[in-house]
Structures are given as C-alpha cells and as structure tokens.
Amino acid sequence: MDSNTLSSFQDILMRMSKMQLGSSSGDLNGMITQFESLKLYRDSLGEAVMRMGDLHSLQHRNGKWREQLGQKFEEIRWLIEEVRHKLKTTENSFEQITFMQALQLLFEVEQEIRTFSFQLI
C-alpha cells in the first residue's frame, strides 16, 4: 500500500472518530466501520496482486470473489454518497475539510481497487 494512502486512511479515521455530529453519530460510526473494512479489502487485493500466484488460491478459496468485488464497489458508492451528504449538511470547516479529504480518498481507493481487480482477472 502506498504510504500516503495509508496515512490518509489513518488520518481520516482519526478525524472522523473525534467528530461529534449529534444525532448522526451512529451514521458516522457506520461510515468509520465501512472505511476500515474497505481499507482491509483494498490491502488484501493489493497483496494478492503482489503475489500473483495467489490468484489461483484466491479463486479456489472463494469462488465468489467477483461478487464480493461488486459488493465492495457498491459500498464505495454508498460511502461516496454518505460523505457527499455530510459535506453538504455540515457548516463546521474542520468537518468539511475532513469529508472533502475522505471523498478524495474514496475516489483514489476505488481506482486502486479497479486496477487491482483488472490485474487479477
């Protein structure tokens, strides 16, 4: 994983965990959980690409990996919409900056996962 992407994930997760958004804190916790899950999935795909021999074991272990890939893209789209919504509704500049960075990170991660998946196909 690119060290900048790793630090971006860690920074955004830390910032989001410090936010107090009132009644929407449950939504924010869900977003944080989704970000963490997405990071782990992206890391595992990246590792599989680095060890191309793992492609066969990945396919044998989980014949539904393409289906899971589709689900991850749905999660990314959901997170993008949630982050956009939060960005539109917040007036706090710290939160706006955090959500703008989160949105940029989601676009980068989506592109990286697409690249990894094409290499695995």
From Swiss-Prot:
Recorded coiled-coil stretches: none
Superkingdom of origin organism: Viruses
UniProt keyword terms in alphabetical order: Host nucleus, Host-virus interaction, Transport, Virion
Gene Ontology biological process terms in this record: exit of virus from host cell nucleus through nuclear pore
InterPro entries, per the entry: Flu_NS2
Signal sequence region: none
Record keyword Nucleotide-binding present: no
GO CC terms in record: host cell nucleus; virion component
Function according to Swiss-Prot or TrEMBL: Mediates the nuclear export of encapsidated genomic RNAs (ribonucleoproteins, RNPs). Acts as an adapter between viral RNPs complexes and the nuclear export machinery of the cell. Possesses no intrinsic RNA-binding activity, but includes a C-terminal M1-binding domain. This domain is believed to allow recognition of RNPs bound to the protein M1.
Family statement drawn from the similarity comment of this UniProt entry: Belongs to the influenza viruses NEP family.
Name of protein: Nuclear export protein
Species whose genome carries this gene: Influenza A virus (strain A/USA:Memphis/10/1996 H1N1)
